[in-house]
Amino acid sequence: MRNCKMARVASVLGLVMLSVALLNLSLISYVSLKKENIFATPKYASPGAPRMYMFHAGYRSQFALKFLDPSFVPITNSLTQELQEKPSKWTFNRTAFLHQRQEILQHVDVIKNFSLTKNSVRIGQLMHYDYSSHKYVFSISNNFRSLLPDVSPIMNKHYNICAVVGNSGILTGSQCGQEIDKSDFVFRCNFAPTEAFQRDVGRKTNLTTFNPSILEKYYNNLLTIQDRNNFFLSLKKLDGAILWIPAFFFHTSATVTRTLVDFFVEHRGQLKVQLAWPGNIMQHVNRYWKNKHLSPKRLSTGILMYTLASAICEEIHLYGFWPFGFDPNTREDLPYHYYDKKGTKFTTKWQESHQLPAEFQLLYRMHGEGLTKLTLSHCA
């Protein structure tokens, strides 16, 4: 009996060890995945389409997450081959783009919701937050209202070609700076630095978003004179650009928002930056993208900027939209952001709130349909 039990234990342990060994092998070596209809185009949906590969060994941890997060979309080997070959010339489909713009405007009055204005709020009015409980409020102060524009900063504005620049590590070494700077209007995300990365991301900035949490993360909540000087100098570099501050997304931004308001009042007239403070815009934006089967906890800043750009731009080019930890052109490891310090590990914290692979899948399909140009290869 005892020998029988020992045999059973040994058998179980053997199976466990075998499973672990197989898992290690699957993570280290190339992993062949059964073909799926990832990209809704005939090329990828055809019966003869190639098998898919999660081909980068350095990406093994992301592959493991595929089983934990159903929104994680593997990238096809054929897409990589397509990028490495001479890409087919992208053609703008103006009719499709105008149709999409009309659809967006049916859900979102972009011009009106781009920013609160002095006439749209009153002192003492209580603002709620898009992603927080309705019990949380922010009272509009006289100082806050004084910083609001008289009219929407994008009222009657129209641009031919706009660049929406995300912060993906795929921009590292891309040499896309000159191409981006040729755009008539450049959207950037989350106050991303450009000075040390101009060759890859350009220097031109017409609008950048500024999540209030940036003040805490990079400027120590302006607690010291040095912190305040650093922030002032960063703002001065914007030189007339729009600083788009989504202060009403989360109630946790309230204290930082008040710090920002005090700072801008203190330096009134010393900075050329244009301030824009959107109200509760996300309920409208979310409604549109939900119709496109995109409904994460939070949309990314990049796709939000695309939404805004659709109202004032005749053509939109996307850069830095690639949420994966490897370069599809070289198969080398990538940082999450192009400005991350060398050696910084690719992060997947975004999975808590965003569906970046699903967003990428949608944008890639839009690229194929000619609605927007999605740059995934080097520009020079």
Swiss-Prot record:
Its cellular-component GO annotations read: Golgi membrane
**Which cellular compartments is it found in?**
Golgi apparatus membrane
Q: Which domain of life is it from?
A: Eukaryota
Q: Which residues bind CMP-N-acetyl-beta-neuraminate?
A: N167, N190, S300, T301, G302, W322, Y336, H337
Describe the family membership recorded for this protein in Swiss-Prot or TrEMBL: Belongs to the glycosyltransferase 29 family.
**Enzyme Commission numbers on file:** 2.4.3.-, 2.4.3.8
Entry PTM: Autopolysialylated.
Q: Corresponding gene?
A: ST8SIA3
Q: What InterPro entries does the record tag this protein with?
A: Glyco_trans_29 (IPR001675), Glycosyltr_29_Sialyltrsf (IPR050943), GT29-like_sf (IPR038578), Sialyl_trans (IPR012163)
The membrane-topology field of this record reads:
Single-pass type II membrane protein
Protein name, entry field? Alpha-N-acetylneuraminate alpha-2,8-sialyltransferase ST8SIA3
Q: List the disulfide bonds.
A: C162-C313, C176-C379
Give the record's GO biological process terms.
N-glycan processing; oligosaccharide metabolic process; protein glycosylation; sialylation
- What pathway is it annotated to? Protein modification; protein glycosylation
Keywords of this entry:
Disulfide bond, Glycoprotein, Glycosyltransferase, Golgi apparatus, Membrane, Signal-anchor, Transferase, Transmembrane, Transmembrane helix
Under the heading Gene3D superfamilies, the entry gives:
Glycosyl transferase family 29
Question: What is known about what this protein does?
Answer: Catalyzes the transfer of sialic acid from a CMP-linked sialic acid donor onto a terminal alpha-2,3-, alpha-2,6-, or alpha-2,8-linked sialic acid of an acceptor, such as N-linked oligosaccharides of glycoproteins and glycolipids through alpha-2,8-linkages. Forms oligosialic and polysialic acid on various sialylated N-acetyllactosamine oligosaccharides of glycoproteins, including FETUB N-glycans, a2-HS-glycoprotein (AHSG) and alpha 2,3-sialylated glycosphingolipids, such as alpha 2,3-sialylparagloboside and ganglioside GM3 and to a lesser extent NCAM1 N-glycans.
What ranges are annotated Lumenal (topological domains)? Answer: 34-380
The catalytic residues are H354 (proton donor/acceptor)
Which reaction(s) does its UniProt entry say it catalyses? [N-acetyl-alpha-D-neuraminosyl-(2->8)](n) + CMP-N-acetyl-beta-neuraminate = [N-acetyl-alpha-D-neuraminosyl-(2->8)](n+1) + CMP + H(+); alpha-Neu5Ac-(2->3)-beta-D-Gal-(1->4)-6S-D-GlcNAc + CMP-N-acetyl-beta-neuraminate = alpha-Neu5Ac-(2->8)-alpha-Neu5Ac-(2->3)-beta-D-Gal-(1->4)-6S-D-GlcNAc + CMP + H(+); a ganglioside GM3 (d18:1(4E)) + CMP-N-acetyl-beta-neuraminate = a ganglioside GD3 (d18:1(4E)) + CMP + H(+); a ganglioside GM3 + CMP-N-acetyl-beta-neuraminate = a ganglioside GD3 + CMP + H(+)
Which GO-annotated molecular functions does the record name? alpha-N-acetylneuraminate alpha-2,8-sialyltransferase activity; sialyltransferase activity
Annotated TM spans = 10-33
Q: How does it assemble?
A: Homodimer.
Residues listed as glycosylation sites in the UniProt record? N93, N113, N206
